[in-house]
Amino acid sequence: MLTFVLIHGAWHDGSCWDEVAAHLRNGGHVVHAPTIAGNGRNADRRVDHAVCTKSIVDFFVSQELGGVVLVGHSYGGTIIAKVAEAEPQRLRRLVFFNAFVLNDSQCLFDETPQNVDHTERGARASGDDTFLPPFDMVRDVFFNTVSREDALRFYGNWTPQPIQPFRDKLDLKKFFTLDVPKSYLHATEDIRVPMPER
């Protein structure tokens, strides 16, 4: 039996893992899927990357977790790297599932330069420095393998994403010295996060 902590990507909350979590629990595993600070309905969206990371570190501490397989998807990859720096002794393995793996001193926007302008425009227009892309902008990128009906259902669970965590440059020097085992999963039909040439 393993203990999994599943960390969602942008615009989501922990409920996006419900089906995966149920499958893992049916296999006898313990599964947690916390929501990153600033995400989810009714969240305080005035957060930066450090606050987001702290929310997951605090979850680990409050739940007294250890021996964890920590999985991060997309933006969640930037969170699990910093959680690993803070609590490496609690981890059995890190899994980057179609996730951003930043270099030291990078921010998420450095890996998605094509998205910066329209995201920043949306954040300025929002009044609270968040961005929720319109459905038609994301249909063929995030929901490219499902029916329109399912795509609309999935999109209906999205909430505005705080953008400051995308801007924050991360000090990852410690991360690259950790001896925590790491796995990198790349789903080939996920076209949102291309496989880096490194």
What does each of the following model-derived ranges do?
Residues L2-R41, V61:
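Conserved HGGG/HGGXW glycine-rich cap/lid loop of the alpha/beta-hydrolase fold
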Residues V30-V69, K82-A86, F109-Q114:
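Active-site loop/oxyanion-hole signature of alpha/beta-hydrolase fold enzymes
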Residues P34, F97, L185:
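The conserved SAM/SAH-binding core of class I Rossmann-like methyltransferase domains
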Residues L70-G72, F97:
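Short beta-strand immediately N-terminal to the catalytic nucleophile in serine-hydrolase-like folds
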Residues G72, G76, I80:
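Gly/Ala-rich beta-loop-alpha elbow adjacent to hydrolase catalytic centers
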Residues E85, R90-F135, P162-F166, L170-D171, ...:
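Flexible "cap/lid" loop of the alpha/beta hydrolase fold
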Residues D136-T145:
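Helix-loop "lid/cap" segments that line or gate small-molecule binding pockets
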Residues P160-R198:
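Conserved serine/cysteine hydrolase catalytic core
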